[in-house]
Amino acid sequence: MKKIGIAITDPEDWTARALIKAAKEKGFSPLVFDLSDAEVRIGSGISEPASIFKAGEVLLSDLDALIVRDVGAGAFEGVSFRFDILRELEAEGVSVINSPEAIQNAANKYHASYLLAKAGLPVPETVAVQSLEAALKVISEFGDAVIKPVFGYKGKDIARVKNREIRFSDRKIEPAPVEEILEKLLEEKGMLYIQEFIENPGRDIRAFVVGGTAIGAIYRKAAAGSWVNNLSQGGSSDRCVLTDEQEKIAEKASLALGTTFAGIDIIEGTEESEENKKTEGMSSENRKSPRILEVNGTPSGKGIFDAWGINPADHILEYLKNIL
C-alpha cells in the first residue's frame, strides 16, 4: 500500500479532513503530520541514508507522495526550513504536491503577477515600488488603486486608495493622511505592491484547477458595504459556470505557476469602469475581459463543495493515484 503524507496545520480544517478521507477511499495509507513538527538529522553517526527526515512518528523520506495542505506560518527561518525540507524530500524521490516552488510562486503575489504576465495571461496593471514618491505617483496615475501585502491571505490587510482616502479591507476609512499611512507601510514592508482597482459586478470568481483541468468554480460576493470578495471577510458564495475564456485562463494560470492543484481568483471587469472610461480605443468586450487577481497554491475546497457538491480532494487523490 502506497504511503501518502498529508501536511496540515489544523486537524479540524475541512480540506484537511477531506484529503484524509479521499486518500483512504483511494486505497492509500495516509500519514498526517504538521511540518512545524519536522526535524532533520544529517551526517555524522548516520550510515544509511545520509539524512533522516521525521515529523513526530512519521518518517518522511519513506513516503511515496506528500500532499501539502498547509506549510504553516511563523518566523522566517522556520518557514524557510519547512520549504527546504519539501525540496529535499523531492530530491529523495518523494512526489510533493504542490511542489515547494509552486507554493512559493503562488504565495508571492508580486512574483505570481510577473509569471502570469510572462505567460501572456491577463492581470490588472501592477506596479511594485520602494519609495513614497513612487507610490504616490502610481496611485495618482491609477485614480483608484489597491495595495496588497505580497505575502497575504484571506483578504487581510488589503487597502484601497481613492480620492486621497485609504480604506483597509477590515476597517473604515483611515483618518490619517494617505502619505503617513503609506510611509508606515513602507517602513514595515520595504516595498509596496500596487494594482489598479478593477470595477466589477461586486463579485469575483474562484476557479479550482486540478491536474490542469478546471473542475468547478464559485462566485464570491462582497458583504454589504465592503469591496473585498473573500469569504473570510464576510462574503458569500454562489455557483459559477465558467465561460470558455475563464476556464482557459484558469488552467493556464495553474500551469504558469507550476501548481498541480490551485484556486485561481478571477475578476470580471465592467464596461462602466472609471478606469475603462479613460482607456481610449478599447472595445466593450475587452473592457469586460477577465483578469487574474491571484493564485492560491494551498486552497480550501469547501466553497466548491458547498456550492456544487464537487470535492476537490477526490480529484487530487485520483490525480495522485494515476501518477504513482
From Swiss-Prot:
Q: What residue spans carry the Basic and acidic residues bias annotation?
A: 275-288
Q: Which domain of life is it from?
A: Archaea
| Catalysed reactions listed for this entry | 5,6,7,8-tetrahydromethanopterin + L-glutamate + ATP = 5,6,7,8-tetrahydrosarcinapterin + ADP + phosphate + H(+)
Which portions of the sequence form the region Disordered?
268-295
Q: What class of enzyme is it?
A: ligase
Residues bound to Mn(2+) 1: D265, E294
Pathway it belongs to? Cofactor biosynthesis; 5,6,7,8-tetrahydrosarcinapterin biosynthesis
Entry cofactors? Mg(2+); Mn(2+)
Q: Give the GO molecular function terms.
A: ATP binding; GTP binding; ligase activity, forming carbon-nitrogen bonds; metal ion binding
Residues that span the membrane, as ranges: none
User: A Pfam family for this UniProt protein?
Assistant: Rimk_N
Instruction: Give the EC number(s) listed in the UniProt record.
Output: 6.3.2.33
Q: PROSITE patterns this protein is in? A: ATP_GRASP (PS50975)
Q: Where ATP is bound, by residue?
A: K148, Q195, E196, F197, I198, E199, N200, P201, G202, R203, D204, R220
Binding of Mg(2+) 2, residues: E294, N296
Q: What GO CC terms are in its UniProt record?
A: cytoplasm
Q: Which UniProt keywords apply?
A: ATP-binding, GTP-binding, Ligase, Magnesium, Manganese, Metal-binding, Nucleotide-binding
Assembly behavior: Homodimer.
What does the similarity note say? Belongs to the RimK family. MptN subfamily.
Q: What is this protein's function per UniProt?
A: Catalyzes the ATP or GTP-dependent addition of one L-glutamate molecule to tetrahydromethanopterin, producing tetrahydrosarcinapterin.
- Protein name as annotated: Tetrahydromethanopterin:alpha-L-glutamate ligase
Please give the organism: Methanosarcina mazei (strain ATCC BAA-159 / DSM 3647 / Goe1 / Go1 / JCM 11833 / OCM 88)
